[in-house]
């Protein structure tokens, strides 16, 4: 099956401006776009740069914009496109481009770390483990699936605006939700203080872009809404 990949290229060490380069190739319908990128790098152009690791939608490394929609190259199959179609591959928006399809996730991870993405338990640990009932775990089960691919943050219009560039972003809020609703966590008030401001949970404008692109089908917008409700509940106490 003939396809053509039109790929964003930019090497800051030698390019003044970004440009696009096309690569025609034959591919099987069941090939992933990541397979096609690897073949281009192996057979046509070894200078092409992109991130990858597991290749199975677990690591989140190969996030990029595919025909204008953010997603994982390892989850998109050739048969998802029309025969002979030119497929446009670009780096995730919002982030600074390091080279070609590779972006700098430093600020993304900095914002993620700002919400304290770990269990905070202040009581003395039990002899065995901090137990939890299955129904308690189900409250945040979906949030655990987040692989930090940054597709949600890159798709968020709030993150894309310079006026709201300090917004912590949907990925960080999903992780905040995960611990805010964890029955074992003992830092609810502390977490609320980190989220109760215009660049925290209230920065979300409920546009659902993040939910639509999440490769792990996490109900991102819904979970952010639950954070807002929890903030209101805490203030009423």
What are these regions (language model features)?
Residues 2-22:
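Eukaryote-biased recognition of intrinsically disordered, low-complexity regulatory segments
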Residues 20-32:
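Short, contiguous acidic and Ser/Thr-rich linear segments
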Residues 26, 66-68:
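Short strand-turn-strand beta-turns centered on an Asx-Gly dipeptide
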Residues 30-43, 90-237:
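Ferredoxin-type iron-sulfur electron-transfer modules in oxidoreductases and energy-metabolism complexes
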Residues 45-51:
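Active-site phosphate-binding and catalytic loops of NTP-dependent enzymes
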Residues 54-63:
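Short, structured protein-protein interaction patches enriched in aromatics and acidic/basic residues
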Residues 81-86:
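Extracellular interaction modules
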């Amino acid at each position: 099956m003939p396809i053509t990949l039109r790929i964003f290229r930019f090497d800051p060490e030698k390019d003044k401006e970004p440009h696009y380069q096309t690569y025609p190739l034959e591919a099987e319908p069941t090939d992933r776009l990541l397979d096609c990128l690897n073949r281009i790098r192996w057979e046509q152009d070894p200078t092409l740069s992109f991130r990858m690791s597991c290749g199975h939608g677990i690591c989140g490394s190969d996030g990029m914009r595919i025909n204008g929609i953010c997603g994982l190259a390892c989850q998109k199959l050739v048969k998802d496109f029309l025969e002979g179609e030119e497929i446009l591959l670009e780096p995730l928006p919002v982030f600074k481009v390091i080279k070609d399809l590779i972006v700098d996730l430093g600020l993304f991870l900095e914002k993620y770390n700002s919400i304290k993405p770990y269990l905070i338990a202040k009581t003395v640990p039990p002899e065995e483990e901090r137990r939890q009932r299955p129904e308690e775990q189900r409250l945040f089960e979906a949030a655990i699936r987040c692989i930090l691919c940054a597709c949600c943050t890159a798709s968020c219009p709030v993150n894309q605006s310079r006026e709201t560039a300090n917004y912590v972003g949907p990925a960080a809020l999903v992780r905040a939700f995960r611990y805010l609703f964890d029955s074992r966590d003992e830092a609810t008030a502390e977490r609320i203080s980190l989220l109760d401001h215009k660049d925290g949970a209230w920065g979300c404008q409920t546009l659902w872009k993040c939910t639509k692109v999440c490769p792990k089908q996490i109900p991102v917008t819904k979970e952010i809404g639950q954070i807002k409700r929890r903030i209101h509940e805490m203030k009423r106490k």
